Amino acid sequence: MTDRSTTLPTASAAALGVRQDALEAFVTALEQNGVELHGLAVVRRGHLVQLGAWTPWQQQRPTLAYSVSKTVTASCVGIAIGDGLLSLDDRVVEVLGPEVTGPVAPGVEQITVHQLLSMATGHTVDTLPAMLWKSDPIRAFCGQAPQAEPGSVFCYNNGATWLLGELVRRVTGERLVDFATRRFLAPLGITDLHWQESFGAEFGFSGCFLTVEQSAAIAELYRCDGVWQGERLLPEGWVERASREQISTAGEENAHSAMGYGYQLWWHPDGFRLDGAFAQYGIVLPEQEAVIAVTSGNFPSLGVMSAVLEHLQPGLAPLTDNPVQAGDPEQISGLEVPWPAGDGDPVGPVRTAGPVRNEQPAEALDQWWFPALADAAVGAQQGGWQLQLTLAGQPTAVDLGTSAWLTTELVAEQGHRVPVATRCRRDGATTTVSLAFIDTPHRLTLTLTEDGAVQRWNCPPLNGAPLAGLSVDYETVTPNRA
């Protein structure tokens, strides 16, 4: 098999007891519930047995993994602890020392490495919003007093993970991405990790771009207690501690997030998972010697996890003690993300004027920022079709696929060129345009009618990212808010 992105050996799905009917039931359940999957990798007993992508996403193109990045950061912390550079009981302000340049709010001086890892800093709101766009994020974190006793309460806290990355940078003298690659990613075959930065420092809490196979490999490393093909990469005992419940998350609204939290890992009765926004998962099932990794674009993301546990997990038959024979994995092909039916190509120009209305669930509009789009139009251009619109006050255009997805580029803010896959379809008087930002989970659908244009996202870009930020090549994400 070609186009691989890890050093995982391969075997046939049948040889390792992964039933084809389980995969078919999984895909059917997603389609029936309107769930958008982008990639799937299944690993059993250390062998890649299923791999594929849903067009226009590509199985060997890294995509933004969001909070799967947290597990990469935590792994670096575990290695630093194993090297004697940190300990779980270290107080963060003492490790940072002179890096703390401002006042330390009451309670912050008590916060330990363990509490950062388990998101139990005592804060009841995320500390990140006050940190992310500051030139001194450490000062911003230390200025936020915990609302409760450190160690007493769980709060999903991206700022805590950013600080873990800063601790690693400080005690190792290396960039986070370099330390991670040198110590544990390169043996997995991950040698060119891209990690988004702000003010010259990797996010830590997010920003890793990984293929679905690479997410599966990291999860498999954890399933194997930090040992990869006979070589110990993570310290002995680290995985056991990181993957068990460190603090209760019983108050979480999402049922799959209410079962407990470890060290930047979510716990559940059958195992644990690496978990990124909008269903980027590396699900570890220790008893079945299996890993199921998915990339996706869903808000909310509950449906993907439920389908994995309901359909894929039961399709893992008991293993025998027979040696595993090398073979080709089951290649998932011929699938594509949901696309509306229609009459065919546009038959003439369609123009709208004024702002593109935002049609999102109320909870999304309340929580997230969306790009300002206006004056959307679709017209003929050099034998094909083109979308024209105004983005953040500037005109831009992108060519459109019709009968199939077209991979091209959108010129976004500050002239940054963003990879997209596009498609356009007509249904009566309605023209639908889809822009898949294929370096990320995000897809924008524009609906144009005589009443104007409406935008809807499969899942909203996080952290105020401009459209220019939806690209692996965008080095420094900066806010783009009115």
Language model regions located:
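Active-site-proximal alpha-helical segments within enzyme catalytic domains
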Residues: A160-L167, S206-V227, Q280-G297
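Peripheral terminal and inter-domain segments
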Residues: P323-A482
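A short, well-structured edge-of-sheet supersecondary motif
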Residues: A22-Q58, G282, E289-A293
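Active-site Gly/Thr loop motif
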Residues: D192, E236-I292
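A small/polar active-site loop signature that marks catalytic segments
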Residues: T121-C155, A160-W195
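Structured C-terminal helix/loop/strand segments within mature extracytoplasmic catalytic/sensor domains
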Residues: G276-P338
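Active-site helix/loop module of the DD-peptidase/beta-lactamase fold
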Residues: L64, D83-T121, G143, T172-L210
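Active-site SXXK
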Residues: G46, T63-D89, L116, L164-V168, ...
